[in-house]
Amino acid sequence: MKKTFTFLFLFLSVVGFAQEVDLEAIHRIKQEGLNNSKVEEIAFRLTDASGPRLTNSPGYKRAADWAVQQLTGWGLKNATLEKWGDFGKGWQIEKSYAAMTAPYYFQISATPKAWTGGTNGPIAGEVTLLAIEKEEDFKKFEGKIAGKIVLVKSGANTNPTFEADASRITDKELEKMAKQPIGASSRYTPEMIAQYMARRAFSRKVDQFLINEKAQLVIRGRNGKHGTYFTSNGASYSADAPPAIAELETAPEHA
């Protein structure tokens, strides 16, 4: 039995080393990837040229139409768009501008929150800082924010930073990543998930409070630093969803 096993092992080893490498094919693959790549052009057409591409938005349609046209131009047959189901409302920014006018003029970097409402033209109003962190805080603002611009403070860290924004992964870190088990358990514990769900529920309650109290506009500070901030969606895209209050997101330094 031992001899049979040794024979098979040697036979497989010989076959493995006998395979010839097609260097010409490898060269052509490298040539296409390194010198003839269209990745940058494709990315430009789908992003900068098409604009924001929320589902069912005009920007999404522009990007999809370009993709069909490009695929057809490359020789693919029957490149078409197919409807996959009923999504809901589309959304896009038509015009957006925000500024502080007193005690002096200051332009604010702010972006409308996806699927929130508009203002139907320029608006102005008194600004109120909303600080609701627990149930007892709601009483403090009842009847005090109607028709006002409500500023919701950001929880982001705005302290100065002294480390580079980017860094290279060391060989030791790469070795540790390579040894990480496949399918390793989530870094989020049940307690962390429960806390996240509780924060989401409380945030929705605050949103409904702002609607009930008839705030004119909401401005929220978002996570980010050095003037860069991350945007998100703030309302339902369902076709039958009620209109949402107008809402902007701004850099944490402004909130």
What function would you assign to each model-found segment?
Residues E175-R199:
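A gly/proline- and charged-residue-enriched helix-loop-helix capping module
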Residues V21-S57, K225, F230-S236:
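N-terminal capping segment at the start of a domain
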Residues M1-T4, Q19:
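Positively charged n-region of N-terminal signal peptides that target proteins for export
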